[in-house]
UniProtKB/Swiss-Prot annotation:
Species: Asparagus officinalis (Garden asparagus)
GO molecular function, one term: ATP binding
InterPro entries assigned: Asn_synth_AEB (IPR006426), Asn_synthase (IPR001962), Asn_Synthetase (IPR050795), AsnB_N (IPR033738), GATase_2_dom (IPR017932), Ntn_hydrolases_N (IPR029055), Rossmann-like_a/b/a_fold (IPR014729)
Catalytic reactions on record: L-aspartate + L-glutamine + ATP + H2O = L-asparagine + L-glutamate + AMP + diphosphate + H(+)
Protein name as annotated: Asparagine synthetase [glutamine-hydrolyzing]
Signal peptide: none
Location of the Asparagine synthetase domain: 193-516
Entry-linked SUPFAM superfamilies: Adenine nucleotide alpha hydrolases-like, N-terminal nucleophile aminohydrolases (Ntn hydrolases)
Top-level lineage group: Eukaryota
GO cellular component: cytosol
Swiss-Prot/TrEMBL keywords: Amino-acid biosynthesis, Asparagine biosynthesis, ATP-binding, Glutamine amidotransferase, Ligase, Nucleotide-binding
């Protein structure tokens, strides 16, 4: 991942303004520690903090067309860039960067080229010939982007909120799958798949078609000129990512540079479900496995840094981001710059445990659509920013456009969870990789119950967070919560604690509105709470809150006094430590 910042039409082309843009761009330097670039054209500034993944030697940004009349700064990866270059034989390229093709596509097709891009991206393109600009964000918001407006009429775009929040009168999240044009001064949706309008699909389930689509998605993401690995929690999604990567690595260009030995990474409290399952999967696949331990106190000590980097006060996101944030730092210290991860599967296939209660296929499908549309505010935000905080890139094959087209066209009746028929959550995905002759995974891993990342790293992690928050948030503070925080009022002491930290870093009113709110049970949308009357009394985002579904569900339901932080158990804090169970099998260096 890289960091981009653009300031356009600021009515100030002075040296002081240039210095200010450079200062703000440096706030994004953690995202791209390899190179800093800035292009100024009059009162327009395009800056870039580069994490060099493709063509590290010559792919510095901003990038240009042949006569430098078109300038582009990009955060992301374009997996089909070689194919796109072949479609433009008359154009000359300065670098081997996958992102350079964007400038040339604009020359040929104007603003109507974005849907040709296969990848994850946010970009700002300045057309100096016509004195205009366009900005766009990938289909579901894998890469973050914010847009803001200054009192002087300027438009600002930044990979993270911290790049523009102090200088804009108003700012907001740039909507995924959209393009913003200065010519119209408005957004236009460029990503319009059939599932987006929530029409119920009817395609029959074909396990081999689904398997092939996912394998293709993983193979695309092996495009790299730097060392890489996979995040492996031992759950279904990350295990499939690891299994498919291990199976296809040998024939890839990446193997020619870095060898065929795949590295896998896992984090958790000692004895956590994820650590045990991940180690078993790693042994089965033959990966070089790196296991990192953290304590509850390690996580608590990192909370402020996590909220600063993730830029949210959402409870679920912070719970899950903290272990990932700690793990990303250790991964980067090994010389690895890119990892492949399993985000998106639960949204596409209805993998969260509350989907057991979906009353019919129509409600099931509508909820998956709502979840995918909201991914950019939750799991995409976490996966991108928790890793980018340390200059590490995360790629997510489940959110491949072509794979989503296949998966979301399946009749949702096939996705429905029906224990009487032996169909647990994500059955269609499990069945697609249940190969008796050439197995991808052991059966008990392939059919392991869903764990949310914040649960799987160790159940005492969430309990410890609640106990810590209870020490810092009093009952009197909770009584005044609605007056202090009228928007997205925190209803638990844990939520109040995170909100206090967030407001210290991002006090602007616009910042508060970038974070989603509303009731949730086990990561559901507010609409899905209607599926079970009991859920309205136990609104906790943990998967264990799905009463009657999770093997380790809260039983009995937590009293409201505990959910607000009262009477929580004391946590014994151990000396922080991180353990490498497996050392690298090959030398990895930056």
């Amino acid at each position: 991942m890289c960091g981009i910042l653009a300031v356009l039409g600021c009515s100030d082309d002075s040296q002081a303004k240039r210095v200010r843009v450079l200062e703000l761009s440096r706030r994004l330097k953690h995202r791209g520690p390899d190179w800093s670039g800035l292009c100024q054209h009059g009162d327009c500034f395009l800056s870039h903090q580069r994490l060099a993944i493709i063509d590290p030697a010559s792919g510095d940004q901003p990038l240009y067309n042949e006569d430098k009349s078109i300038v582009v700064t990009v955060n992301g990866e374009i997996y089909n860039h070689e194919e796109l270059r072949r479609r433009l034989p008359d154009h000359k390229y300065r670098t081997g960067s996958d992102c350079e093709v964007i400038a040339h596509l604009y020359e040929e097709h104007g603003e109507d080229f974005v849907d040709m891009l296969d990848g994850m991206f946010s970009f700002v393109l300045l057309d100096t010939r016509n004195n205009c600009f366009v900005a766009a964000r990938d289909a579901v918001g894998i890469t973050p982007l914010y847009i803001g407006w200054g009192l002087d009429g300027s438009v600002w775009l930044s990979s993270e909120m911290k790049g523009l929040n102090d200088d804009c009168e108003h700012f907001e999240v740039f909507p995924p799958g959209n393009l913003y044009s200065s010519r119209s001064g408005s957004f236009r949706r460029w990503y319009n798949p059939q599932w987006y309008n929530e029409t119920i699909p009817s395609a029959p389930y074909d396990p081999l078609v689904l398997r092939k689509a996912f394998e293709d998605a993983v193979i695309k993401r092996l495009m790299t000129d730097v060392p890489f690995g996979v995040l492996l929690s031992g759950g279904l999604d990350s295990s499939l990512v690891a299994a498919v990567t291990a199976r296809h690595l040998a024939g890839s260009k990446a193997a020619e540079q870095w060898g065929t030995q795949l590295h896998s990474f896992c984090v958790g409290l000692e004895g956590s479900p994820d650590l045990k399952a991940a180690k078993e999967v790693a042994e089965y696949l033959g990966t070089v496995h790196h296991e990192f331990h953290f304590t509850v106190q390690d996580g608590i000590d990192a909370i402020e840094d996590v909220i600063f980097h993730i830029e949210t006060y959402d409870v679920t996101t912070i719970r899950a981001s903290t272990p990932m944030f700690l793990m990303a730092r250790k991964i980067k210290s090994l010389g690895v710059k890119m990892v492949i991860s399993g985000e998106g599967s639960d949204e596409i296939f209805g993998g969260y445990l509350y989907f057991h209660k979906a009353p019919n296929k129509e409600e099931f499908h509508h909820e998956t659509c709502r979840k995918i549309k909201a991914l950019h505010q939750y799991d995409c935000l976490r996966a991108n920013k928790a890793t980018s905080a340390w200059g590490l890139e995360a790629r997510v094959p489940f959110l491949d456009k072509e794979f989503m087209d296949v998966a979301m066209s399946i009749d949702p009746e096939s996705k429905m969870i029906k224990p009487d028929l032996g169909r647990i959550e994500k059955w269609v995905l499990r069945k697609a990789f249940d190969d008796e002759e050439n197995p991808y995974l052991p059966k008990h891993i392939l059919y392991r119950q869903k764990e949310q990342f914040s649960d799987g790293v160790g159940y005492s992690w969430i309990d410890g967070l609640k106990a810590h928050a209870a020490k810092h948030v009093t009952d009197r503070m909770m009584l005044n919560a609605a007056r202090i925080y009228p928007h997205n009022t925190p209803t638990t002491k844990e939520a109040y604690y995170y909100r206090m930290i967030f407001e210290r870093f991002f006090p602007q009113n616009s910042a508060r509105f970038t974070v989603p709110g509303g009731p949730s049970i086990a990561c559901s949308t507010a609409k899905a709470i209607e599926w079970d009357a009991r859920w309205s009394n136990n609104l906790d985002p943990s998967g264990r809150a799905a009463l009657g579904v999770h093997d380790s569900a809260y039983d009995p339901p937590l009293p409201s006094s505990i959910s607000a932080g009262k009477g929580a158990a004391m946590i014994t804090n151990k000396k922080p430590r991180i353990v490498d169970v497996a050392t690298p099998g090959v030398v990895i260096s930056t």
